[in-house]
Structure formats: structure tokens, C-alpha cells
């Protein structure tokens, strides 16, 4: 996929964009992946929050974010701390 449009980056970093998926202590399971795919089919941006304790450090968080993007055929358009926004590319 090519470069992410500026408009998408701006929308992704907006704090008003609501968190629509939370990943808890069970981690990235199939039902979470399916929910993200469903949301990406109806909207272009999905904001996800990892609850405390899911990832121990920033490298583990980035690995989880990368895995989510790969499994949902999307792109990480924004990440900060335990928050990631995935873009469907549409």
C-alpha cells in the first residue's frame, strides 16, 4: 500500500475519534480479529486500545499492532502508547 493520505493521518490522531475495540487480558484472539474486520468493512478507521498488562513494553505493543494490521489487511495509520488506529485503505 502506498503512503497514507494526510487527511487520514489527521483523522487518526484526533482524540475525538472513539475507541471501538478494546483488547483485554485474553489478548489478540480470533473474535477480536473478526470484530476489527467487521468494523473495517463498514468504516475506514478503527481505534483500538490495549488494556494494561496486555503488552509489557513498546516493542511488544508494536508487534501486536503489526499483527493486527496484517491479519485484518489494514494499515497502522497512528499509534501512541496503548492506542492504535487501523486504516482499511479505502
At which residue positions do the language-model features occur?
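Positively charged, polar, low-complexity stretches
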Residues: 1-90
Amino acid at each position: 500500500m502506498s503512503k497514507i493520505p494526510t487527511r487520514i493521518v489527521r483523522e487518526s490522531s484526533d482524540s475525538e475519534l472513539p475507541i471501538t475495540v478494546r483488547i483485554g487480558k485474553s489478548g489478540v484472539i480470533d473474535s477480536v480479529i473478526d470484530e476489527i474486520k467487521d468494523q473495517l468493512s463498514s468504516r475506514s478507521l478503527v481505534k483500538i486500545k490495549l488494556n494494561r498488562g496486555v503488552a509489557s513494553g513498546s516493542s511488544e505493543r508494536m508487534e501486536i499492532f503489526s499483527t493486527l494490521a496484517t491479519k485484518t489487511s489494514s494499515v497502522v495509520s497512528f499509534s501512541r502508547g496503548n492506542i492504535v488506529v487501523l486504516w482499511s485503505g479505502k
